[in-house]
Protein backbone atom coordinates (compact mmCIF):
# COMPACT_ATOMS: atom_id res chain seq x y z
CA UNK A 1 0.00 0.00 0.00
CA UNK A 2 1.27 3.47 -0.88
CA UNK A 3 1.86 5.85 2.02
CA UNK A 4 -0.95 8.34 2.55
CA UNK A 5 -0.21 12.05 2.48
CA UNK A 6 -1.83 15.38 3.33
CA UNK A 7 -2.51 18.27 0.95
CA UNK A 8 -3.54 21.76 1.91
CA UNK A 9 -6.63 23.03 0.12
CA UNK A 10 -8.96 25.99 0.22
CA UNK A 11 -12.61 26.50 -0.61
CA UNK A 12 -13.32 28.07 -4.00
CA UNK A 13 -15.79 30.90 -3.68
CA UNK A 14 -16.15 31.24 -7.46
CA UNK A 15 -16.16 28.69 -10.28
CA UNK A 16 -15.83 29.01 -14.03
CA UNK A 17 -13.10 29.52 -16.62
CA UNK A 18 -12.17 33.00 -15.44
CA UNK A 19 -11.81 31.87 -11.84
CA UNK A 20 -9.78 28.82 -12.91
CA UNK A 21 -7.35 30.95 -14.92
CA UNK A 22 -6.88 33.25 -11.94
CA UNK A 23 -6.15 30.29 -9.68
CA UNK A 24 -3.50 28.96 -12.06
CA UNK A 25 -1.81 32.36 -12.22
CA UNK A 26 -1.51 32.15 -8.42
CA UNK A 27 0.03 28.66 -8.39
CA UNK A 28 -3.22 26.80 -7.68
CA UNK A 29 -5.46 24.51 -9.70
CA UNK A 30 -9.21 23.93 -9.36
CA UNK A 31 -10.47 20.66 -7.93
CA UNK A 32 -13.70 19.14 -6.66
CA UNK A 33 -14.57 16.69 -3.88
CA UNK A 34 -17.60 14.48 -4.50
CA UNK A 35 -19.20 11.29 -3.20
CA UNK A 36 -20.34 9.87 0.15
CA UNK A 37 -23.85 11.22 -0.54
CA UNK A 38 -22.70 14.78 0.03
CA UNK A 39 -22.89 17.75 -2.35
CA UNK A 40 -19.77 18.45 -4.45
CA UNK A 41 -17.28 20.80 -2.83
CA UNK A 42 -15.25 23.13 -5.08
CA UNK A 43 -11.70 23.60 -3.81
CA UNK A 44 -8.27 24.75 -4.95
CA UNK A 45 -5.00 22.87 -4.37
CA UNK A 46 -1.33 23.64 -4.95
CA UNK A 47 -0.25 23.18 -8.57
CA UNK A 48 3.24 22.17 -7.45
CA UNK A 49 1.99 19.52 -5.01
CA UNK A 50 -0.35 17.95 -7.57
CA UNK A 51 2.25 18.04 -10.35
CA UNK A 52 4.79 16.11 -8.28
CA UNK A 53 2.23 13.63 -6.95
CA UNK A 54 0.97 12.80 -10.45
CA UNK A 55 4.43 12.33 -11.93
CA UNK A 56 5.71 10.33 -8.94
CA UNK A 57 3.28 7.53 -9.82
CA UNK A 58 0.47 5.88 -7.88
CA UNK A 59 -1.56 9.08 -7.73
CA UNK A 60 -4.94 7.39 -8.26
CA UNK A 61 -4.21 4.47 -5.93
CA UNK A 62 -3.04 6.45 -2.90
CA UNK A 63 -5.38 7.85 -0.26
CA UNK A 64 -4.87 11.51 0.61
CA UNK A 65 -6.13 13.81 3.35
CA UNK A 66 -7.22 17.28 2.29
CA UNK A 67 -6.72 19.88 5.02
CA UNK A 68 -9.25 22.67 4.51
CA UNK A 69 -9.06 25.23 7.33
CA UNK A 70 -9.67 23.08 10.43
CA UNK A 71 -11.43 20.32 8.50
CA UNK A 72 -9.71 17.17 7.24
CA UNK A 73 -11.31 15.11 4.49
CA UNK A 74 -10.07 11.67 3.41
CA UNK A 75 -10.13 11.31 -0.37
CA UNK A 76 -8.93 9.19 -3.26
CA UNK A 77 -7.89 10.98 -6.46
CA UNK A 78 -10.20 9.61 -9.16
CA UNK A 79 -9.34 11.64 -12.24
CA UNK A 80 -7.28 14.56 -13.43
CA UNK A 81 -7.06 16.70 -16.54
CA UNK A 82 -3.72 17.59 -18.14
CA UNK A 83 -2.92 20.32 -20.62
CA UNK A 84 -2.77 18.49 -23.98
CA UNK A 85 0.37 20.34 -25.09
CA UNK A 86 2.38 21.14 -21.98
CA UNK A 87 1.30 18.14 -19.88
CA UNK A 88 0.68 20.06 -16.66
CA UNK A 89 -2.37 19.48 -14.41
CA UNK A 90 -5.47 21.60 -14.99
CA UNK A 91 -8.08 20.01 -12.72
CA UNK A 92 -8.47 17.15 -10.22
CA UNK A 93 -11.48 15.12 -9.08
CA UNK A 94 -11.32 13.68 -5.55
CA UNK A 95 -13.66 10.98 -4.23
CA UNK A 96 -14.65 11.43 -0.58
CA UNK A 97 -14.06 8.16 1.32
CA UNK A 98 -13.69 6.67 4.78
CA UNK A 99 -11.27 4.09 6.12
CA UNK A 100 -13.96 1.43 5.64
CA UNK A 101 -14.83 2.40 2.06
CA UNK A 102 -14.52 -0.13 -0.76
CA UNK A 103 -13.34 1.65 -3.90
CA UNK A 104 -12.77 0.81 -7.56
CA UNK A 105 -9.21 1.49 -8.69
CA UNK A 106 -6.99 0.66 -11.65
CA UNK A 107 -3.97 -1.09 -10.15
CA UNK A 108 -0.79 -1.29 -12.29
CA UNK A 109 0.68 -4.68 -13.14
CA UNK A 110 4.38 -5.30 -12.46
CA UNK A 111 6.09 -8.31 -14.06
CA UNK A 112 8.88 -9.94 -12.04
CA UNK A 113 11.80 -12.20 -13.00
CA UNK A 114 11.75 -11.48 -16.72
CA UNK A 115 15.43 -12.47 -16.91
CA UNK A 116 14.67 -15.99 -15.69
CA UNK A 117 11.45 -16.60 -17.66
CA UNK A 118 12.05 -19.68 -19.88
CA UNK A 119 10.02 -18.26 -22.75
CA UNK A 120 11.81 -14.92 -22.74
CA UNK A 121 15.25 -16.53 -22.43
CA UNK A 122 14.52 -18.44 -25.65
CA UNK A 123 13.67 -15.28 -27.54
CA UNK A 124 9.97 -15.01 -26.77
CA UNK A 125 8.27 -11.65 -26.40
CA UNK A 126 6.11 -10.55 -23.47
CA UNK A 127 2.85 -9.28 -24.97
CA UNK A 128 1.09 -7.23 -22.28
CA UNK A 129 -2.67 -7.17 -22.77
CA UNK A 130 -3.48 -5.25 -19.59
CA UNK A 131 -1.05 -2.80 -18.00
CA UNK A 132 -3.61 -2.17 -15.25
CA UNK A 133 -6.36 -4.27 -13.66
CA UNK A 134 -9.57 -2.64 -12.47
CA UNK A 135 -10.21 -3.92 -8.94
CA UNK A 136 -12.26 -3.29 -5.86
CA UNK A 137 -10.20 -2.81 -2.71
CA UNK A 138 -10.45 -1.39 0.81
CA UNK A 139 -9.59 2.30 0.69
CA UNK A 140 -7.02 1.83 3.46
CA UNK A 141 -5.34 -1.17 1.79
CA UNK A 142 -4.97 -0.41 -1.92
CA UNK A 143 -1.89 -2.26 -3.25
CA UNK A 144 0.70 -0.22 -5.14
CA UNK A 145 0.85 -2.89 -7.84
CA UNK A 146 -0.19 -6.41 -8.74
CA UNK A 147 2.94 -8.52 -9.12
CA UNK A 148 3.21 -11.42 -11.57
CA UNK A 149 6.18 -13.81 -11.45
CA UNK A 150 7.26 -14.84 -14.96
CA UNK A 151 9.86 -17.41 -13.90
CA UNK A 152 7.69 -20.41 -14.88
CA UNK A 153 6.20 -19.19 -18.16
CA UNK A 154 7.25 -20.47 -21.59
CA UNK A 155 6.55 -19.46 -25.17
CA UNK A 156 2.86 -19.92 -25.93
CA UNK A 157 1.75 -19.47 -22.32
CA UNK A 158 -0.99 -17.04 -21.35
CA UNK A 159 -1.35 -15.44 -17.94
CA UNK A 160 -4.97 -15.21 -16.82
CA UNK A 161 -6.40 -13.44 -13.79
CA UNK A 162 -7.15 -16.81 -12.17
CA UNK A 163 -3.40 -17.47 -11.95
CA UNK A 164 -2.70 -14.25 -10.06
CA UNK A 165 -2.55 -14.17 -6.26
CA UNK A 166 -4.35 -10.97 -5.30
CA UNK A 167 -3.99 -9.38 -1.85
CA UNK A 168 -6.70 -9.97 0.74
CA UNK A 169 -10.04 -8.27 -0.05
CA UNK A 170 -8.81 -7.15 -3.49
CA UNK A 171 -10.98 -8.50 -6.31
CA UNK A 172 -11.15 -7.88 -10.06
CA UNK A 173 -14.17 -5.90 -11.21
CA UNK A 174 -14.61 -8.28 -14.16
CA UNK A 175 -16.05 -11.48 -12.69
CA UNK A 176 -17.73 -13.14 -15.66
CA UNK A 177 -14.60 -14.37 -17.46
CA UNK A 178 -11.02 -15.43 -16.85
CA UNK A 179 -9.45 -12.56 -18.75
CA UNK A 180 -5.91 -12.52 -20.12
CA UNK A 181 -3.31 -10.19 -18.65
CA UNK A 182 -0.32 -11.13 -20.81
CA UNK A 183 1.05 -13.78 -23.15
CA UNK A 184 4.52 -14.91 -24.14
CA UNK A 185 4.64 -15.14 -27.90
CA UNK A 186 7.26 -16.44 -30.30
CA UNK A 187 9.19 -13.90 -32.37
CA UNK A 188 8.31 -13.76 -36.05
CA UNK A 189 11.36 -15.78 -37.11
CA UNK A 190 10.85 -18.65 -34.63
CA UNK A 191 9.19 -21.95 -35.58
CA UNK A 192 6.70 -22.50 -32.76
CA UNK A 193 6.53 -26.26 -33.48
CA UNK A 194 10.22 -26.56 -32.57
CA UNK A 195 9.56 -24.89 -29.23
CA UNK A 196 6.62 -27.21 -28.50
CA UNK A 197 8.68 -30.29 -29.38
CA UNK A 198 11.47 -29.14 -27.09
CA UNK A 199 9.02 -28.68 -24.22
CA UNK A 200 7.58 -32.16 -24.77
CA UNK A 201 11.06 -33.71 -24.81
CA UNK A 202 11.93 -31.95 -21.57
CA UNK A 203 8.72 -33.24 -19.94
CA UNK A 204 9.44 -36.83 -21.06
CA UNK A 205 12.96 -36.71 -19.64
CA UNK A 206 11.76 -35.58 -16.20
Swiss-Prot record:
CDD domains tied to this protein: Ribosomal_L25_TL5_CTC
Top-level taxon of the source organism: Bacteria
GO MF terms, alphabetically ordered: 5S rRNA binding; structural constituent of ribosome
Protein's GO biological process: translation
SUPFAM superfamilies named among the record's database cross-references: Ribosomal protein L25-like
Matching InterPro entries: Rbsml_bL25/Gln-tRNA_synth_N, Ribosomal_bL25/Gln-tRNA_synth, Ribosomal_bL25_b-dom, Ribosomal_bL25_C, Ribosomal_bL25_long, Ribosomal_L25_dom, Ribosomal_uL5_bac-type
Alphabetical keyword list: Ribonucleoprotein, Ribosomal protein, RNA-binding, rRNA-binding
Gene Ontology CC entries for this record: cytosolic large ribosomal subunit
UniProt cross-references to PANTHER family, sorted A to Z: RIBOSOMAL PROTEIN L25/GLN-TRNA SYNTHETASE, ANTI-CODON-BINDING DOMAIN-CONTAINING PROTEIN, RIBOSOMAL PROTEIN L25_GLN-TRNA SYNTHETASE, ANTI-CODON-BINDING DOMAIN-CONTAINING PROTEIN
Family: Belongs to the bacterial ribosomal protein bL25 family. CTC subfamily.
Subunit structure, interactors included: Part of the 50S ribosomal subunit; part of the 5S rRNA/L5/L18/L25 subcomplex. Contacts the 5S rRNA. Binds to the 5S rRNA independently of L5 and L18.
Protein task: This is one of the proteins that binds to the 5S RNA in the ribosome where it forms part of the central protuberance.
Protein's name according to its UniProt entry: Large ribosomal subunit protein bL25
Organism per entry: Bartonella henselae (strain ATCC 49882 / DSM 28221 / CCUG 30454 / Houston 1) (Rochalimaea henselae)
Amino acid sequence: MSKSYTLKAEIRERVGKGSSRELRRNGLIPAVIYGDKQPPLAIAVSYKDIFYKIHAGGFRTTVATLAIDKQKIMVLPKDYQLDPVRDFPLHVDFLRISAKSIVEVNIPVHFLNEDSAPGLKKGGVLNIVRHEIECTAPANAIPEAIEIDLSSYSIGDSIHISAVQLPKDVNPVIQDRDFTIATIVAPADMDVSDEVSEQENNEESE
